[in-house]
């Protein structure tokens, strides 16, 4: 998995999660928003990022910039599925990904689906085990994609 110098225009953004977070100070509570964004060009490049700000659009913008900086390239088989079975892990999250026959579609939940569709995977079977926390699920999916090897 190598780093990508992609044009900003060709990467498509997907907001995976928006969360209101609170900081308790002497005078009361301060609210801000955290966003998790996945970017990809549907041709094997994907990145993710998180951002925090006082307003939702600002948080999404920060997360998007962070995601574009972390964009990496992934090895796909025939441009539609992964070359072999792989297990990605991060924290308590474990994502099992298996290649699928043409026409199967993306069988994945929430955060994992966002990553795989951004990469450009069209046929895959996945199962998220352990925590289904979006941050950990996205990182576990990216970890699994990093392990992919191109078949000769």
From Swiss-Prot:
Is the keyword Cytoplasm in the record?
A: no
What the entry lists under Pfam families is as follows:
Ribosomal_S5, Ribosomal_S5_C
The residue ranges of the S5 DRBM domain are 11-74
Name one cellular component (GO) term. Answer: small ribosomal subunit
Locate the coiled-coil region(s) and give their ranges: none
Is DNA-binding there in the keyword field? no
Record key words, sorted: Ribonucleoprotein, Ribosomal protein, RNA-binding, rRNA-binding
The text the record gives for the protein's domains is: The N-terminal domain interacts with the head of the 30S subunit; the C-terminal domain interacts with the body and contacts protein S4. The interaction surface between S4 and S5 is involved in control of translational fidelity.
Family according to the record: Belongs to the universal ribosomal protein uS5 family.
Q: How does it assemble?
A: Part of the 30S ribosomal subunit. Contacts proteins S4 and S8.
Q: What is this protein called?
A: Small ribosomal subunit protein uS5
- Species assigned in the record: Bdellovibrio bacteriovorus (strain ATCC 15356 / DSM 50701 / NCIMB 9529 / HD100)
